[in-house]
């Protein structure tokens, strides 16, 4: 089915584009003034039988909100160990576990957000953070006894009775991510158990989880669990039914903000990836809220197993195709964005497997132009439209190209009515940026000590533009600024310090082509003691994106740049030293939290001219107003 509507100019559409919706963080009762270090394991208290906990249900014709476990803790069905907890689940019981942990199924089977797992020795690692809906772990029926590998231990033998359907073990994962709040306090409550034990208010069961990296949410809370209603279940089953050809499926999920696009796509991804011989691909084209990409990037990734909880793209073992956009919105450079989008689309047919497309929550103005270009390039077999309903639906759909329409109605949802904590898009972007820069790829841990407390990497740069000399130079060849707007070369240092840049490698032949193009167009600028300035966005060549870096400072006397980056610097240095590739940095407008530049942990006293409460004048970026018409006198 192919439908068409009147064409929309990308530039004209910018004037009518939606503004980003910001959902502010609401302080909760779990928001203490200080964050303490992890305490050692203590003996668990004796648990009294509690009343059954139940999820919080909304009013009729509104979405169901699950904010806690459906589980009755007793001294029998919960076994505490050093670094782990074993829990027995009865039929119809489920757990909402907040925090980070590995899950092992010791008896029977469980469902994690509709994905069935049988007992096995293979652990499932889960980051159940409250940045998004928290996975639910439900007791489930075994479907194939050949898949069951029960583990009976003396301490849990009493759980292997007809009273219990499933037995699971949760193990600690203290990898440093739980200390994010020390650097960025706005997100300290995405992890549990950050309160001081002496000030902790809660039941004996809640206190028993204090030493662990996770906790079972026992009572109604301000967290949100993943709930799959009947409409979603039917849509997911229709898309993954055996009658269809999953290998050839291309699914585009669209909808306005807060309709659950990302959650629906994640559930569909998991259903497909749960099959042994299916490896779905995800085309993530939302640079503002990327689920499967690095900050300010779009990507094409392949997934071989389900994803439960928070996903970290830099932990992916399989290489991804990444395009650096440099901005958190396509509005900045719409033509470049669409060009990058088409470049990614051209690689889709090189790998087998279904394709799922994670689109921005932007279905008006320039967002329609993006979706139109995307559907023309991808030709989706299924268009999943999560809609609140309205007259604008048909106007949107008639502009898009697709074969089958799956319309999923979305009831209105207001998180404030349920005291659900929601974080703003900027806070989530800060989380992704901080977790990326503070990950140690060698130790496979996070370290949220301020970057300023570490020694940066040093890289020399060229301040000359002689062709032969530049080709032989083993350091930084030049810097490209995506929105340079005829920047003065003498102001380059001020434009670079404390800024996030992308690291690109070019094969020598590609660099020679780029050099010749820039010379011909007058795009190569050099100034003594300053890095070379490339007024070129590198679109005409094929550079390899290596990752992001934060520039600490520029030393114009010794001609080197200090920077921080989590990428494999040793491999990059070896490649440059052997003169196999050339190095170029590209700067966009990536945001960095103030806490990274001026961390609170440096001093307990107030810093002059610095505030963490609000932006000062001139702190926010200024956008050019478009279509401003003034009357002449």
Protein language model features and the residues they cover:
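Generic detector of well-ordered alpha-helical segments enriched in charged/polar residues
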Residues: 233-237, 338, 342, 372
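Conserved lysine of the Walker
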Residues: 261
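The conserved Walker
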Residues: 257
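Preference for solvent-exposed, low-hydrophobicity sequence contexts
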Residues: 2-249, 253-254, 267, 271, ...
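C-terminal catalytic or substrate-handling cores of phosphate/nucleotide-
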Residues: 341-344, 348-390, 396-405
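Short coil/turn segments at secondary-structure boundaries
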Residues: 115-117, 266, 294-296, 313, ...
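Nucleotide-state-sensitive switch-loop elements of NTP-binding domains
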Residues: 246-248, 254, 276, 281-355, ...
């Amino acid at each position: 089915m192919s439908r068409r509507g009147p064409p929309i100019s990308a530039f004209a559409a910018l004037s009518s584009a939606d503004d980003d919706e910001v959902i502010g963080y609401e302080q909760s009762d779990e928001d203490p003034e200080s964050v303490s270090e992890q305490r050692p394991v203590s003996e668990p208290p004796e648990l009294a039988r509690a009343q059954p906990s139940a999820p919080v249900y909304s009013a009729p014709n509104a979405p169901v909100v699950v904010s806690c476990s459906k589980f009755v803790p007793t001294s029998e069905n919960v076994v505490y160990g050093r670094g782990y907890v074993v829990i027995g689940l009865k039929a119809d019981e489920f757990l909402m576990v907040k925090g980070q942990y590995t899950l092992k199924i010791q008896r029977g089977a469980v469902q994690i957000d509709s994905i069935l797992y049988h007992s096995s020795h293979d652990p499932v690692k889960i980051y159940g953070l409250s940045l998004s809906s928290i996975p639910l772990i439900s007791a489930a029926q075994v479907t194939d006894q050949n898949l069951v590998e029960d583990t009976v231990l003396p301490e849990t033998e009493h759980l292997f009775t007809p009273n219990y359907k499933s037995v699971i073990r949760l193990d600690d994962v203290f990898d440093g991510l739980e200390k994010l709040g020390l650097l960025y306090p706005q997100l300290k409550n995405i992890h549990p158990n950050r309160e001081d034990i002496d000030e902790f208010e809660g039941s004996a069961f809640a206190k028993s989880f204090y030493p662990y990296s996770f906790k079972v949410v026992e009572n109604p809370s301000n967290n949100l669990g993943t709930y799959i209603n009947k409409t979603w279940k039917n849509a997911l089953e229709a898309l993954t039914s055996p009658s269809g050809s999953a290998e050839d499926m291309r699914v585009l999920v669209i909808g306005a903000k807060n309709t659950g696009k990302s959650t629906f796509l994640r559930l569909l991804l998991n259903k497909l990836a749960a099959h042994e011989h299916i490896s779905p691909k995800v085309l993530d084209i939302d640079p503002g809220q990327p689920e499967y990409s690095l900050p300010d990037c779009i990507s094409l990734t392949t997934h071989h197993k389900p994803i439960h909880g928070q996903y970290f793209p830099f932990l992916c073992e399989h290489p991804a195709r990444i395009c650096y956009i440099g901005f958190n919105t396509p509005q900045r450079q719409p033509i470049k964005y669409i060009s990058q989008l088409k470049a990614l689309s051209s690689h889709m047919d090189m790998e087998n497997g279904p394709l799922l497309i994670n689109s921005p929550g932007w279905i008006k103005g320039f967002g329609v132009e993006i979706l139109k270009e995307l559907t023309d390039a991808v030709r989706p077999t299924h268009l999943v439209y999560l809609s609140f309903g309205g007259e604008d639906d048909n106007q949107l759909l008639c502009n898009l190209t697709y074969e089958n329409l799956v319309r999923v109605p979305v009831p209105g949802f207001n998180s404030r009515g349920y005291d659900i904590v929601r974080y703003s898009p900027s806070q989530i972007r800060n989380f992704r940026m901080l977790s990326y820069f503070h990950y140690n790829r060698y130790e496979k841990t996070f370290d949220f000590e301020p970057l300023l407390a570490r020694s940066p990497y040093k890289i020399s740069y060229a301040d000359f533009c002689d062709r032969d000399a530049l080709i032989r130079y083993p350091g930084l060849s030049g810097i490209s600024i995506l929105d340079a707007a005829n920047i003065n070369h003498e102001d380059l240092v001020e434009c670079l310090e404390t800024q996030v840049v992308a690291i690109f490698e070019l094969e020598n032949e590609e660099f020679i082509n780029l050099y010749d193009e820039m010379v011909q167009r007058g795009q190569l600028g050099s100034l003594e003691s300053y890095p070379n300035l490339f007024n070129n966005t590198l679109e005409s060549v094929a550079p390899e994106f290596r990752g992001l870096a934060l520039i600490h400072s520029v030393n114009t006397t010794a001609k080197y740049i200090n920077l921080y980056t989590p990428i494999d610097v040793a491999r990059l240095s070896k490649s440059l030293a052997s003169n196999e590739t050339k190095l170029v940095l590209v700067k966009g407008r990536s945001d960095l939290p103030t806490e990274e530049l001026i961390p609170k942990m440096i001093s307990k006293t107030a810093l002059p001219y610095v505030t963490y409460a609000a932006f000062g004048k001139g702190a926010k970026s200024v956008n050019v107003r478009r279509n401003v018409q003034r009357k002449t006198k």
